[in-house]
Amino acid sequence: MSWKRAKMETVVQVFDPFAKNEDGEFSKNPVELPARSFKQVIHWKDGEILIVETQDEQGQLLHFYYENKDELLSISLNDNRTLETEDILPYQLRFRSRYKDDRSRALEETGIIYKAIAYHISDDNHVFLSIGDFESGHFALLNPKTYDLISIHNRLWLEDENWLELKIVFKNYETYRWQTYAKVTEYFLDNRLFKRATVSKIRTLSRLPIKGLQEQAWKLRHLQTATLQNDYAL
């Protein structure tokens, strides 16, 4: 990773992966849900800081994620639009860290616990570097020459012991300040698109605006504590 500190902005589109047409069949084209879209401002310092502000189209804060060394806060702020941590994390940044522990954590955050490394040849004879357990469905594929992340694969188990295939695809790679990054990240359930994140702005920074972000995290942490005390008051 060539960047030490960066600010990234993304626009996230959300789709209904199981929308049906008039005949009751799954729609061939994904149906976008504009009211569910959101945007993000991401501040990142390799190995130390990851702060994600997730906002609606009007700029109202929906979720705030604050990670600064050992400090961690992840809070959903809109009762009508609950977002979990896995909904908002920009996975490619941690995957490209220069620090082994961060790269390992990125794998674990996407369900890849067993980290065996091997070459994988696809049906169309493309060669990838595979990390994880290919047979179990929990693995990541990388370009063996550039180490660019190509895709992450996982399985979401259902109550009836069946599963849905989760696939995250990283594509349209561009280069900024000697570092490649995926301009577009797409999320699929059983090969049906349900989310697309597009990087709209990116720049490296000499310093993060950490003081203001720390103050915001402090206020939100105390708000969360006060809300819990109120909700569970006897």
Question: Locations of the language-model features?
Answer:
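Non-transmembrane domains of secretory- and envelope-associated proteins
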Residues: 11-17, 25-26, 58-59, 79, ...
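Coil-to-beta-strand transition motifs
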Residues: 46-50, 124-126, 134-137, 144-151, ...
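Beta-strand-dense domains in secreted/periplasmic systems and polymorphic toxin scaffolds
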Residues: 52-54, 75, 152-153, 168, ...
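N-terminal mature ectodomain segment of secretory-pathway/periplasmic proteins
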Residues: 1-79, 133
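Aromatic-rich beta-strand edge motifs centered on tyrosine
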Residues: 42-44, 63-70, 89, 99, ...
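Short, surface-exposed linear segments at secondary-structure transitions and domain or protein termini
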Residues: 48-49, 72-75, 94-98, 150, ...
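Flexible, processing/modification-adjacent segments and terminal tails
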Residues: 4, 68-146, 155-162, 219, ...
